[in-house]
Amino acid sequence: MKTKFKHIWLFILLLILGNSIAQENKKNIYIVPIQDTIDLGIPSFVKRAISIAESNNSELIIFDIDTFGGRVDAATQIKDAISATDITTIAFINRRAISAGSLISLSCDKIYMTDG
């Protein structure tokens, strides 16, 4: 429960910060964190984020990924949601994308990684 609450607050914070940065650059970019264990709560979070980005005519969605993995069925739902959007998607692998995280990353249009 704490993880879901943390994800929701982080998502709201990133939306606010992402929107303020995008306003300065006149681009509509959304950053969606996918961190910690991939469980069955994450797909609805990602679907909601994609829906918000679509309704706001976003040009780009960046998925900030740092996970050891988790449930493959949840990752498959996330993959399907990412594949269904017409918005350009980027997986930013911030340290690790193992197992389910790899599947999610591969569903994006582009993948970028940090060292390590």
Where are the regions that the model predicts?
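Soluble extramembrane regions of membrane proteins in the secretory/endomembrane system
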Residues: A22-G116
